[in-house]
């Protein structure tokens, strides 16, 4: 007890000696920490003057003995005062008091005080500001950082706790090691342990009222080291706004502000809006630290436990502040190593202070050695001097595997060039291949890609990064592609610095030679369909009964973790099969309800293409082609031919339209059937009275379009006559040109009374003009072909001129010269001169001998179509293309139960004939659908093997065959006169009815006339 009393007396003496000292005021300019990591915070709104600052990592531990310093200042130069026991205070003019470096013993640690007796002031404290759950950003670019990367962890579900233990504190999660939260579709699954910021997994804390420090934060439960306590939330602002608010709050009488430095030039202001994290006080011996984490695309700040914290302890961290102004703020932490003031020196006079994590990443052996080495320099730091000069004399230790995590985490958040250079230098000097593999695994390519984009204007830093990339172990291109670093290195090939250009070019050549390793693609999860409740599934992994009987066993607990979600332990899994093995009997089977059993292949299945059906209790077998048999087949069935490829809807519709137009034009007039059929007059469709004059409300452009559509059938009538004389593309172009000329001329001369119809006289004039137009085009085309043939004949010595011309006319594929209708008939704006003379079709047909035969054949076909039911041209073409199928052979002998090859072929032809008859009678699609179905409908069973005598069956089959041949012969004889251009194999082999044969022959004649 006496020793304890002496210790308390000693601490009180130190506290009194520190607080009674007077420091000379010194003026200093306001500035921001140049390194962007040290945080500037101003005091809190309580008389304690405690600051709310933002250190970026764990605060410093209690300093070790500094008696090892060999360059300590002489004692006679600096006055010292012994305030109690072995503790000595050193005082310098104008400087805050500090412990003497000559102390030979470490300060004795003290037990952390508990504040369990203080009442909860959370409600009272939250009334002084606006409570927020997330940070607000002045603009969307504030707090932005590189997107979080995917980790390599897999799901690990613990059945006992029903939690996903992946990415935990003790795991080797890459994201957790580099201070990134798993975000989106990481492979670790839903609700992993590395989503604390997103799920707001705050510790149980409460606000208390302290004696001297005002409001403080108290832990209501025990906390483990590195446990997440609270996120520091407020308004994220930029530096100009920060400076304006400093002045604004001072004018409003707010003496204590809550600013935390989030990034270089970015601050979190929790003065008026924030959460309970703003009440965490300062201490020179803290139990918490502040760290920055990447969450999605934002950088966020959280408070974490630095050591084991008991319930009732006050949560404090080292503000590590750079003071703005000359007035030092007193510190009331009461720790043995307390310097008495928060921040100490002003911004321009301070010594270099870095976060604990940054010091470890730089390779400094002892965090205290950093401050000691800086303080022992023979001169003070000058205003505006870079911190880099203070660390040049320090030799960092070599990088090992354990230090890679700290280096990559610090490099990920580094915004200061001199710190980035030091960290990159540690990686560059490393020669251990295992360490380099570790760097690559810790998102090495992604982090170096970010640094390369940040410092691409500094060629020295770029060379340093390229040298590190060149030393990386390379097996595949996967990580290089995922990091997208090739897009950053590629522009460096055009760099002004030759060293950078050569290095970048060589690196890209090496990368391009690597192969891409195949990886199983990760399943993309739908964020909206996330369900955190484990559900029972018949195929999921179940826990064994042994694990259920030993819930407290560590061995069974370790086995209960699996890669996938396990069955909910609160539900009773079916135990039917297990009950039978234990002698449960039928009683246990009553509650066993298995799920749907998997499909099992039937025993001794039929060969491919065969199916079974029943008839009168007997089983027979059939194939898709119609082959049937009573005996079980042993060989695969002959597969039916694939269904014909269906035409597209657009082509089918166009064929229907063309068929209607051809039938309309080929319709002869009733008054002169004997004469050569003239061009059909325009079909007058009766319209409703109210729609008769609707076209008058249209614009002139729309009326022209309507009139052009009216002329189109008559222009097409002439175009069809020239389709074998001109190339298709030229024919279409000329048709459009002549239609435009006719429309413009008629509208210019006011010859259009109604754009929806034209008179018979106009029809003849239009056709005459179109014929003259295309005759000139044909003449031009032939002249062009002749000239081309002459040029070919000159180049060929052996070929004759006549042979060259014939060959050019038949095999030429070049486009003919552009036919300028305006050059022959006048300008486009000039009127089209239409004569009143009637256009005689006989003149045209006399000049084209083959056209007369085709026209007469078309008229006959049209009449036959109307007499026989109006079969469209499309159907006629389909009929012509189908092969003629011979009739089926007589049925097989019932005495032969096993079909031979001839019988099978006969049944196949018989079945195919039935399908063709259905197709021509109904639709061409039905048979295709039957062929595509998996199991076709069973055909009628084959004749019974023994019920009917064979003699009767053979006689009936012969009579049926004779009758079918007689009917087919009658049909063939009735249409014999029309089939002059196509040969039919045999009357008895024709499966087509009379109508189909007639259409078939007409189509053949039409094809022959065209040729």
Curated annotation (Swiss-Prot):
Domain SET: 203-320
GO cellular component: chromosome; nucleus
GO biological process, one term: methylation
Gene3D superfamilies: 2.20.70.10, SET domain, Set2, Rpb1 interacting domain
Domain WW residues, every copy: 604-635
Name assigned to this protein: Histone-lysine N-methyltransferase, H3 lysine-36 specific
Pfam families: AWS, Med26, SET, SRI
Catalysed reaction equations from the record: L-lysyl(36)-[histone H3] + 3 S-adenosyl-L-methionine = N(6),N(6),N(6)-trimethyl-L-lysyl(36)-[histone H3] + 3 S-adenosyl-L-homocysteine + 3 H(+)
Stretches with biased composition (Basic and acidic residues): 10-27, 74-84, 538-551, 684-697, 782-793, 901-914
């Amino acid at each position: 007890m006496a020793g304890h009393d002496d210790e308390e007396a000693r601490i009180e003496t130190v506290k009194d000696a520190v607080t009674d000292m007077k420091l000379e005021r010194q003026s200093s300019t306001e500035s921001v920490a140049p390194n962007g990591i040290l945080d500037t915070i101003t005091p809190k709104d309580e008389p304690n003057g405690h600051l709310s600052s933002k250190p970026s990592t764990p605060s410093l531990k209690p300093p070790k003995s500094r008696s090892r310093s060999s360059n300590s200042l002489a004692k006679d130069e600096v006055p010292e005062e012994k305030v109690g026991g072995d503790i000595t205070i050193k005082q310098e003019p104008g400087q805050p008091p500090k412990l003497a470096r000559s102390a030979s013993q470490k300060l004795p640690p003290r037990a952390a005080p508990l504040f369990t007796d203080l009442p909860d002031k959370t409600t009272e404290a939250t009334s002084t500001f606006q409570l927020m759950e997330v940070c607000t950003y002045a603009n969307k670019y504030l707090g932005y950082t590189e997107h979080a990367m995917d980790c390599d962890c897999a799901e690990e579900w613990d059945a006992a706790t029903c939690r996903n233990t992946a990415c935990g504190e003790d795991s080797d999660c890459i994201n957790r090691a580099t201070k990134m939260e798993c975000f989106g579709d990481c492979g670790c699954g839903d609700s992993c342990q590395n989503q604390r910021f997103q799920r707001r997994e705050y510790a149980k804390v409460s606000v208390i009222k302290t004696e001297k420090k005002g409001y403080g934060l108290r832990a209501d439960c025990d906390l483990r080291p590195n446990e997440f306590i609270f996120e520091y939330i407020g308004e994220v602002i930029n530096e100009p706004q920060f400076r304006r608010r400093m002045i604004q709050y001072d004018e409003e009488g707010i003496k204590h502000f809550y600013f935390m430095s989030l990034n270089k030039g970015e601050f979190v202001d929790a003065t008026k809006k924030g959460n309970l994290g703003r009440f965490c006080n300062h201490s020179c011996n803290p139990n918490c630290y502040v760290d920055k984490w990447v969450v999605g695309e934002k950088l966020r700040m959280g408070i974490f436990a630095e050591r084991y914290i008991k319930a009732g302890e006050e949560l404090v961290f080292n503000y590590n502040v750079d003071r703005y102004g000359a007035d030092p703020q007193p510190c009331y932490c009461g720790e043995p190593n307390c310097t008495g003031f928060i921040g100490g020196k002003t911004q321009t006079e301070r010594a270099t202070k870095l976060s604990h994590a940054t010091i470890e990443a730089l390779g400094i052996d002892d965090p205290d050695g950093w401050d000691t080495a800086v303080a022992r320099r023979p001169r003070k730091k000058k205003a505006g001097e870079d911190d880099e000069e203070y660390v040049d004399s320090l030799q960092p230790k070599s990088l090992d595997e354990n230090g890679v995590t700290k280096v990559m985490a610090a490099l990920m958040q580094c915004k200061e060039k001199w710190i980035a250079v030091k960290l990159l230098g540690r990686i560059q000097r490393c020669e251990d291949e295992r360490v380099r593999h570790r760097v690559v695994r810790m998102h090495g390519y992604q982090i170096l890609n970010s640094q390369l984009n940040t410092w691409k204007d500094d060629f020295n830093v770029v060379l340093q990064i390229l040298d590190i990339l060149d030393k990386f172990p390379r097996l595949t291109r996967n990580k290089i592609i995922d990091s997208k670093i090739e897009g950053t290195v590629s522009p460096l090939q055009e760099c002004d610095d030759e060293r950078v250009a050569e290095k970048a070019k060589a690196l890209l050549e090496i990368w391009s030679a690597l192969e891409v390793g195949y990886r199983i693609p990760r399943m993309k999860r739908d964020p909206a369909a996330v369900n955190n409740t484990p559900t029972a599934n018949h195929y999921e992994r179940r826990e064994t009964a042994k694990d259920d009987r030993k819930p407290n066993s560590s061995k069974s607990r370790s086995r209960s973790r699996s890669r996938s979600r396990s069955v909910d332990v609160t539900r009773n899994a079916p135990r039917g099969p297990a009950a039978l093995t234990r002698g449960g009997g039928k009683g246990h089977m009553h509650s066993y309800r298995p799920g749907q059993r998997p499909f099992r292949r039937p025993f001794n299945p039929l060969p491919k293409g065969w199916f079974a059906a029943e008839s009168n209790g007997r089983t027979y077998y059939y194939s898709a082609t119609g082959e049937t048999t009573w005996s079980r087949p042993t060989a695969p069935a002959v597969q039916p031919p694939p269904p014909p490829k269906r035409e597209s809807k657009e082509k089918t519709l166009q064929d229907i339209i063309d068929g209607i137009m051809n039938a309309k034009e080929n319709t002869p007039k009733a008054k002169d059937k004997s004469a050569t059929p003239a061009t059909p007059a325009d079909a007058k469709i009766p319209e409703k009275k109210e729609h008769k004059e609707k076209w008058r409300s249209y614009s002139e452009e729309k009326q022209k379009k309507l009139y052009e559509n009216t002329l189109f059938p008559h222009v097409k009538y002439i175009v069809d006559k020239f389709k074998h004389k001109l190339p298709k593309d030229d024919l279409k172009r000329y048709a459009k040109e002549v239609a435009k000329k006719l429309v413009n001329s008629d509208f210019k001369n006011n010859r259009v009374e109604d754009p929806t119809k034209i008179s018979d006289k106009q029809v003849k004039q239009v056709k005459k003009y179109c014929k003259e137009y295309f005759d000139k085009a044909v003449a031009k085309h032939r002249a062009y072909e002749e000239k081309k043939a002459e040029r070919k004949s000159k180049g060929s010595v052996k070929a004759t001129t006549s042979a060259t011309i014939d060959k050019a006319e038949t095999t030429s594929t070049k486009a003919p010269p552009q036919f300028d209708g305006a050059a022959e008939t006048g300008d486009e704006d000039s009127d089209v001169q239409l004569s009143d003379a009637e256009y005689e079709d006989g003149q045209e047909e006399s000049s084209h001998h083959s056209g007369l035969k085709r026209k007469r054949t078309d008229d006959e076909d049209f009449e036959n179509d109307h007499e026989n039911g109006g079969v469209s041209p499309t159907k006629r073409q389909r009929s012509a293309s189908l092969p003629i199928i011979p009739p089926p052979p007589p049925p097989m002998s019932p005495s032969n139960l096993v079909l031979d090859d001839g019988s099978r072929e006969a049944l196949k032809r018989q079945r195919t004939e039935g399908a063709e008859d259905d197709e021509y009678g109904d639709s061409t699609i039905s048979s295709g659908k039957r062929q595509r179905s998996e199991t076709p409908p069973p055909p009628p069973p084959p004749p019974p093997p023994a019920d009917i005598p064979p003699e009767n069956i053979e006689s009936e089959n012969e009579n049926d065959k004779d009758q079918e041949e007689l009917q087919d012969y009658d049909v063939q004889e009735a249409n014999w006169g029309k089939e002059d251009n196509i040969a039919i194999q045999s009357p008895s082999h024709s499966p087509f009815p009379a109508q189909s044969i007639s259409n078939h022959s007409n189509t053949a004649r039409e094809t022959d006339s065209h040729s």
